[in-house]
Regions:
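Charged, low-complexity surface segments at secondary-structure and domain boundaries
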Residues: 54, 353-357, 405-407
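N-terminal extramembrane/targeting module of integral membrane proteins
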Residues: 32, 56, 87-90, 365
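Membrane-embedded transmembrane helical bundles of large multi-pass transporters/channels
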Residues: 1-49, 112, 137-400, 523, ...
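Structured non-transmembrane domains adjacent to transmembrane bundles in polytopic membrane proteins
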Residues: 50, 57-81, 88-173, 399-600, ...
Length: 719
């Protein structure tokens, strides 16, 4: 008598029962240990995070060179905080007494290296104090000093109708750090909550979503443990935005891989009573697409190592570590959990050979989609391509040339409010001068050229002998600064040019670009730095990165697809449709951001969106086309394409919704970069999994026919 389940009989002759129990037990215990060790590092990760722009610039950038020299001129690694006090009318004697008392209180705070005298404005309606803060320690220490400084300002007795705020580079740094505070709390809660709701709707089971979420969290714990260890050893540099992207990427990717494996496991349970054989079948069916898709994402991410910006360079390996742990968890922990729980995981409706947990393939939504693509393939791909192309036209509204530092934080920002007060009563660059290092012999020539330049309010030279730390130039013989001498370090002096415009404005950037020409003309060895120059160098490096890395990512992913699918035509088809999807997401995203009043974006936003959308978009196409290729080899091209679409439709769309939801969760962090990235990537993933993967790719594959697989032997098969 022949058994209806030969795999069950072969199981009895194969791996012994004790080993089938031991393997999942060891895997589960191993992951529990990794999660137990990695979990506590969540709270420690912020201690190795840096959000200082200058630390991410290439060493050859002028602003980086100047930043490295500043401690030698100023005596310490310091960052200025500017306390500005203003009123609608002239400050009275009582208010000025309060400002003097505030200056004395600030000078006594731990972490405050030095304070300037109170500097009243020309209109008499404002006063400012520059406090130099110790920036040699972790960023959290600096943030703590700013918080104490703000507490002193809040408690100061300045009188009625007087406004006060802490701004300047230290103020903006503290505001950005505060914006990132929720990154390991509310961000994870929102992302995991959204994923859990989606999984409950997909599986209609209370237990299976918990197993999938545990897999994702375990993968994240291991990734954080590895990244924290490398950052502690100064092998990696971590920023707040990289930390947020790591969290979201691991949760989304690990859940996606879990969805793919679970679909194969459920399908196998409908064909055999044996959980062990179902596990082996699911691993055979899911390992190749999961490893291939994850490997493609890793390859795309590692292209960021070619970036000039250290922040971009480090995102590549950090995110690649996250994808690697997601693959590992999806192919070890989840199979072990599902093997242990078996059909109970799918309760209340568990698949069995007598009652498979699947509908007939020609029924339901994906049966209808497959019939539409089958009957109207040409119309489907033409209409879909036109819709996507129309959306891509929104790219003309894209403004990816940089964002003022005052706009980095979405919502309330005391530093931004303080900068507005400062600009209303003082030159906009007060407290945040452009720093120019020149040979001592060129001091007078460069200082004169700077003073004559348009957009410069005044020029000073750094001096340890001066009570204010600098000497205004040219020196007035009758002034108290006349006896002070400039600080000379290795034959160089530090000039400080105060700009008329706010240091993060477009006007200031234009002035500093012109000042660099002025300085280089007056001194061959002169270099220009400071906050505005740092922003210029960062934006310029980001634009160079975009022009270099995008083509390289396309070439790398093309080669991977050709090797995986053994087809040049299929690889180019998938890549072209994914790039079209990216263009649509970028265009529609630009229109949405313009409507929201935040059209300007950092140049790295389109680059990051490209890497994620192209790599992840190809990810979903790999899920589809590996199954299609498998089916084409068995039942021919046309039937294989349609069956691949039907059987993968639900799982891939669910995976896309999960990833879109996790990236959308980045929007809860009030940082403009992350909000814009969240909108564009979430849009792109939804577009890719609903329109591109479900309609455009299958319809084009039917239109092209077996030539889709050229030059492999599948290209010579029947239609």
């Amino acid at each position: 008598m022949t058994s209806s389940h030969p795999t069950d009989r072969s199981e009895r002759r194969g791996v012994p029962r004790w080993l089938r129990v031991l393997i999942p037990a060891v895997l589960i215990l191993g992951w529990l240990a990794a999660a137990g060790i990695g979990g506590p590092t969540f709270g420690k990760l912020s201690t190795v995070v840096s959000n200082d722009q200058t630390s991410f610039l290439p060493a050859t950038a002028e602003s980086t060179e100047v930043q490295a020299l500043l401690p030698e001129f100023l005596g310490a690694d310091e960052l200025p905080a500017i306390v500005v006090v203003a009123a609608d009318a002239e400050l009275d004697a009582s208010a000025l007494e309060g400002v003097d008392a505030l200056q004395q209180a600030i000078a006594e705070l731990d972490g405050v290296v030095e304070t300037s005298p109170v500097v009243p404005s020309d209109d008499g309606q404002a006063a400012q104090i520059v406090a130099l803060l110790d920036a040699s320690g972790p960023s959290s220490d600096l943030t703590g000093v700013v918080e104490e400084l703000r507490a002193e300002v809040t408690d100061a007795d300045l009188g009625e109708g007087v406004q006060a705020a802490v701004t300047g580079p230290a103020g903006f740094t503290a505001d950005i750090a505060a914006a990132f505070e929720g990154i390991d709390g509310i961000l994870l809660l929102v992302a995991l909550g959204a994923v859990f709701i989606i999984l409950v709707l997909v599986y209609r089971s209370p237990l299976l979503p918990l197993l999938v979420l545990f897999t994702s969290v375990a993968a994240l714990c291991l990734a954080i443990l590895i990244v924290f260890t490398l950052a502690q050893a100064d092998i990696l540099t971590l920023s707040g935005q990289t930390q947020g992207i790591l969290f979201i990427l691991v949760v989304g990717a690990a859940t996606d891989y879990a969805l793919l494996y679970t679909a194969r496991f459920r399908e196998a349970l409908g064909q055999t009573q044996s959980r062990w054989q179902a596990t082996l079948a699911a691993l055979r069916g899911s390992t190749e697409p999961i490893v291939a898709s994850g490997g493609t994402v890793i390859a795309g991410l590692l292209c960021l190592l070619l970036s000039d910006l250290v922040s971009n360079q480090q995102l590549g390996p950090v995110a690649a570590i996250g994808i690697a742990t997601s693959i590992l968890a999806g192919l070890t922990l989840l199979p072990a959990l599902l093997l242990a729980f078996g059909r109970v995981a799918f309760w209340p409706v568990a698949p069995t050979p007598a009652r498979p947990r699947t509908k007939p393939e020609d029924k339901g939504v994906w049966g209808a989609v497959a019939r539409l693509v089958d009957r109207r393939s040409r119309a489907v791909w033409i209409v879909t391509a036109l819709v996507l192309g129309a959306g891509a036209l929104g790219v003309t509204q894209l403004q990816a040339n940089g964002v003022p530092s005052s706009d980095f934080v979405v919502g309330e920002s005391e530093a931004r409010d303080g900068q507005a007060l400062l600009s209303a009563h003082y030159p906009g660059g007060s407290g945040s001068p452009t720093q120019v290092v020149v040979p001592e012999a060129d001091q007078d020539a460069v200082a004169e050229a700077l003073a004559d330049a348009e957009g410069v309010e005044g020029v000073a030279v750094a001096s340890e002998d001066s009570p204010s730390g600098s000497i205004p130039l040219p020196v007035d013989p009758a002034s108290p600064f006349a006896a002070a001498a400039p600080t000379v370090v290795d034959g160089q002096v530090l000039l400080q040019a105060t700009l008329v415009a706010a240091p993060d404005s477009d006007e200031a950037q234009q002035v500093v670009r012109e000042l660099r020409d002025v300085v280089h003309g007056a001194s061959a060895d002169g270099i220009v730095g400071g906050p505005t120059a740092t922003a210029i160098d960062t934006n310029d490096a980001s634009q160079r990165d975009r022009a270099l890395i995008i083509p390289i990512v396309l070439v790398v992913i093309s080669l991977i697809l050709m090797l995986l699918l053994r087809s040049i035509a299929a690889a180019l088809l998938l890549l072209a449709t994914t790039v079209l999807s990216y263009g649509t997401a970028l265009g529609v995203g630009a229109l949405i951001l313009t409507a929201l009043g935040i059209p300007a974006m950092d140049p790295s936003v389109p680059l990051f969106a490209f890497v994620f959308l192209v790599a992840l978009g190809v990810d979903y196409n790999i899920f589809l086309m590996t199954r299609v290729r498998e089916e084409v080899g068995r039942i021919g091209h046309r039937r294989g394409v349609l069956r691949g679409l039907r059987v993968t439709g639900g799982v891939i769309t669910s995976a896309g919704v999960v990833l879109a939801a996790t990236f959308a969760a980045l929007g809860v962090i009030p940082v403009l970069f992350l909000l814009q990235l969240a909108i564009i990537v979430a849009l792109g993933v939804l577009i890719d999994t609903t329109l591109v993967r479900s309609l455009l790719v299958p319809a084009l594959a039917l239109e092209i026919g077996p030539n889709t697989w050229w030059p492999s032997k599948l290209g010579r098969g029947p239609r």
